[in-house]
């Protein structure tokens, strides 16, 4: 439940911690100072600037082309092939195509990608519901395929149990929150395919079938929509906690059954270069794959005019940038001699 690092705790501190935990009225909270002193696991992109680890909704009207879109991104991620102008990080993909059969999937994939072998894309047409052990099935799959990046559930309704309160905010929020907990614990992306409702709204995301509880619990959502059902042109709107809001203009290639990018409505804002991170990348690289030392030693090594504490806090906050932009893992641990900083180059996957 909590992210307390027991390796960093002294015996007296640990005793006090467990005494507090035994108090039924104890409320666990962090001070702002403690928050800055933590290093959190990086949020890794599956498709950079578009899709990250976490739980997302992918919503559209029936037969608008959602399943073709799911097959397309599943293929690209499993093969490590960039999609449009977006960089893809390769990994195993599990696609629960619960409204399809294997014969239809075979025809669809062959039409889209031709005669192409792919041992990193797995497809299933049946699964348990969430209350009947789906999470255990997914955990088992990840155990067999630890490089799993993406799990697609097509559709969300297929894994929900039918009940009288199925359209309540509480039940909508609960099912997505449970799936989000799973994705966070396993550092994977869950993409939940869902339908829109017929009623229109000024906010396109309010057309998601069900209550606002679905979007409220999710890390983000994608909405695929057409002005005319017979038109090959569509827009894809994206919102989320870890990526910028976007609108992409797409066109469906009817011959190959794939979605093609026509244009993006706006250019994505990028973070400016960070001089401290740049300096770290100069001492940790393919020639020098590891650096271990104290924060004081690191200040000297980098030639910086800041305190060791300020440096480690800056690195704590930017651990995800080090990981995703510079391919460097970062640890900040307590030892008997004080705080120890460790940088390591992450080995790049070879084909």
Where do the language-model regions lie?
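Short, small/acidic-rich helices and loops at N termini and domain boundaries
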Residues: 1-24
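Detector for small/aliphatic-rich hydrophobic stretches
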Residues: 17-38
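Pre-Walker A (Motif I) flank of P-loop NTPase domains
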Residues: 52-56, 91
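Post-Walker A helix-loop "phosphate-sensing" segment adjacent to the P-loop in P-loop NTPases
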Residues: 76-90
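DNA transaction DNA-binding modules
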Residues: 249-351
């Amino acid at each position: 439940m909590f992210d307390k690092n027991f390796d960093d705790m002294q015996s007296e501190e640990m005793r006090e911690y467990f005494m507090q935990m035994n108090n039924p009225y104890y409320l666990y909270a962090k001070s702002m100072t403690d928050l800055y002193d933590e290093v959190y696991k990086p949020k890794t992109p599956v498709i950079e600037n578009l899709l990250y680890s976490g739980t997302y909704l992918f919503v559209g009207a029936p037969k608008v082309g959602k399943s073709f879109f799911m097959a397309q991104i599943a293929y690209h991620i499993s093969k490590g092939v960039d999609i449009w102008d977006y960089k893809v990080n390769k990994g195993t993909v599990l696609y629960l195509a619960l409204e399809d059969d294997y014969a239809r999937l075979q025809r669809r994939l062959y039409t889209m990608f031709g005669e192409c072998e792919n041992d990193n894309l797995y497809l299933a047409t049946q699964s348990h519901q969430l209350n009947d052990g789906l999470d255990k099935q997914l955990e088992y799959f990840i155990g067999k395929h630890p490089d799993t990046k993406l799990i697609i559930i097509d559709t969300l309704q297929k894994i929900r149990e039918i009940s009288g309160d199925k359209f309540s905010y509480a039940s909508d929020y609960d099912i997505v929150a449970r799936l989000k907990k799973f994705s966070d614990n396993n550092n994977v992306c869950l993409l939940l395919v869902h339908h829109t409702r017929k009623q229109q709204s000024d906010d396109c995301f309010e057309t998601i079938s069900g209550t606002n509880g679905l979007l409220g619990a999710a890390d983000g959502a994608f909405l695929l929509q057409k002005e005319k059902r017979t038109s090959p042109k569509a827009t894809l709107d994206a919102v989320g906690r870890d990526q910028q809001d976007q609108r992409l203009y797409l066109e469906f290639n009817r011959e190959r059954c794939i979605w093609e990018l026509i244009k993006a409505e706006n250019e994505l804002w990028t973070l400016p270069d960070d001089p401290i991170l740049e300096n770290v990348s100069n001492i940790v690289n393919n020639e020098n794959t590891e650096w271990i030392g104290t924060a004081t030693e690191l200040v000297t090594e980098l030639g910086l005019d800041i305190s060791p504490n300020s440096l480690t806090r800056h690195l704590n906050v930017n651990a995800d940038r080090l990981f995703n932009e510079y391919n460097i893992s970062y640890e900040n641990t307590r030892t008997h001699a004080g705080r120890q900083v460790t940088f390591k180059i992450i080995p790049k996957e070879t084909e």
